[in-house]
């Protein structure tokens, strides 16, 4: 059930676009997002429209995390140190964190605490994988920004 005025078919299409991009992230990560202008425009536009529906964001992140844990046979988000994570799994985590970075204010606190932060932890502790470290760091900074917006008074 949508929690915004974005029609459900649009939400479904945008969700599928992000899921397809998840499958080809290993290619775009090799060349960088700057090498694919159309990809970047579609990626950030899909994230922007989906961010208007918190339930759609939560469902997509939950599905992506479930696939990550199931596909790579991981028992918990932070079950392995970064040095022992295979490249495919690391790419999957990095893409998920890129998505989450844009939506931290839309996701429930329990998801952040039980899933997102544990996914970030191995890459914040072991900084040898630059893309993953940057994604994890960006998520943490986005969390701080989100918290600041909720707790700091607005200047008037």
Task: Indicate residue ranges for each PLM-predicted region.
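Extended, helix-rich scaffolding/adaptor regions
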Residues: 1-52
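Acidic, Ser/Thr- and Gly/Pro-rich intrinsically disordered linkers and low-complexity segments
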Residues: 60-84
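Alpha-solenoid helical repeat scaffolds
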Residues: 95, 134-135
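Hydrophobic residues within the alpha-helices of tandem HEAT/HEAT-like
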Residues: 100, 139-146
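Conserved small/polar residues in nucleotide/adenosyl-binding loops
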Residues: 150-155
